[in-house]
């Protein structure tokens, strides 16, 4: 059973104090039996969105009730219900390059998770993502991708390769889980030689269906770590328009549905041009997703577009292939050495 309680005409401090008091009482009386979520809004609000936000936190709380850990490799070891259902053995991270259309050079990448079945075949996320979101296990998968990305960047650093910015997708379950900032900070601390400014949290569409104030507060927990944010699938829904004006994203990713029609639909091209102009005014990067041909590239360049991602340039590829084809040596051409790697006389 699920019970929803609504607290009206109170301040945020009083509300949170009540929440934590009730949560503590329930955990003492019914240890590991009660799942608990909450959400706060000020001024006008949508009850449906608040319940969705609270339920997302509750599903994350379910994992802790069940005794799981926020360790980033957890989905690989413990996601047995998902793996058994979909026939998966493990998860791997692929990278899809982001390209400067003016020069054709790779300027970054998006980290994307894939499953591997018992035959060693790659399984797309559409086969398992919905189940992981409904079970709340998506948070551990997001953290696994973040940790795997940082581990890859550390390997590249030690090889003397030039590091590029990488974006990692975060679902609403991960973004709104109270324990996520601590888990992210713990992961970042394991890679002290990788600048957090090279990482971008890409907010998936599912995270957008919440109160704007709640979204801003959730993002503010991660900003002190040096992380930036991108708004994914911009233009696919009307609700994104209000987010564009009220939330300080660092990057806007144009939805593929907008890019697909820019050759045949003059209005789509004008809309894309306006969005690119707004991004430039607000000092945001703008990336066109789903670019599939040279005609789209030419059209985007003509209206001020600079960056793109899509099959025309590259499909999502394994880490090693990305390293070999899209990374170059640093200026020195020599790997940097950590203090732990350096030897002194007598060692």
Regions found by a protein language model. Name each.
Residues 2-42, 185:
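GGDEF/GGEEF active-site signature
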Residues 40-44, 105-107, 137-215, 290:
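Catalytic core of bacterial c-di-GMP phosphodiesterases, primarily the EAL and HD-GYP domains
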Residues 30-35, 91, 109, 164-166, ...:
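PAS and PAS-like sensory/regulatory domains
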Residues 23, 153, 157, 216-224, ...:
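Surface-exposed amphipathic alpha-helices with a cationic face
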Residues 51-55, 59, 66-71, 101-105, ...:
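EAL-family c-di-GMP phosphodiesterase catalytic domain
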Residues 90-130, 149, 250:
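A short, well-structured catalytic beta-strand-centered motif of the EAL phosphodiesterase domain
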Residues 18-33, 152-158, 188-190, 327-330:
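Short catalytic/binding micro-motifs of nucleotide second-messenger systems
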Residues 27-35, 48-76, 81-92, 119, ...:
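Catalytic/regulatory signature loops of cyclic-dinucleotide turnover enzymes
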């Amino acid at each position: 059973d699920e019970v929803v309680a609504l607290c009206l005409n109170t301040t945020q401090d009083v509300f949170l104090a009540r929440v934590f008091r009730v949560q503590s009482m329930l955990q003492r009386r019914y240890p590991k039996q009660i799942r608990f979520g909450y959400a706060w809004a000020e001024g006008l609000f949508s009850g449906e969105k608040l319940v969705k936000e609270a339920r997302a936190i509750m599903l994350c709380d379910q994992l802790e009730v069940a005794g799981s850990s926020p360790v980033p490799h957890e989905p690989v070891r413990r996601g047995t219900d998902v793996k058994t259902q979909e026939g998966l053995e493990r998860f791997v991270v692929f990278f899809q390059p982001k390209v400067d259309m003016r020069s054709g050079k790779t300027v970054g990448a998006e980290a994307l998770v894939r499953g591997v079945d018992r035959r060693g075949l790659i399984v797309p996320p559409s086969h398992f993502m919905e189940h992981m979101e409904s079970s709340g296990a998506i948070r551990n998968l997001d953290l696994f991708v973040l940790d795997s990305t940082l581990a890859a960047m550390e390997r590249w650093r030690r090889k003397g390769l030039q590091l590029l910015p990488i974006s990692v997708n975060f679902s609403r379950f991960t973004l709104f889980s109270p324990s996520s900032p601590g888990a992210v900070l713990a992961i970042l601390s394991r890679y002290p030689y990788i600048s957090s400014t090279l990482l971008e949290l890409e907010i998936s569409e599912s995270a957008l269906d919440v109160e704007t104030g709640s979204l801003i507060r959730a993002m503010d927990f991660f900003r002190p770590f040096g992380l930036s944010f991108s708004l994914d699938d911009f233009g696919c829904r009307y609700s994104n328009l209000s987010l564009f004006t009220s939330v300080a994203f660092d990057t806007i990713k144009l939805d593929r549905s907008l890019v697909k029609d820019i050759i045949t639909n003059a209005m789509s091209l004008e809309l894309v041009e306006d969005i690119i102009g707004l991004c430039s005014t607000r000092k945001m990067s703008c990336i066109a997703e789903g670019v599939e041909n040279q005609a789209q590239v030419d059209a985007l360049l003509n209206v001020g577009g600079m960056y793109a991602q899509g099959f025309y340039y590259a499909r999502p590829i394994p880490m090693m292939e990305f390293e070999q084809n899209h990374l170059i040596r640093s200026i020195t051409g020599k790997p940097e050495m950590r203090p732990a790697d350096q030897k002194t006389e007598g060692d």
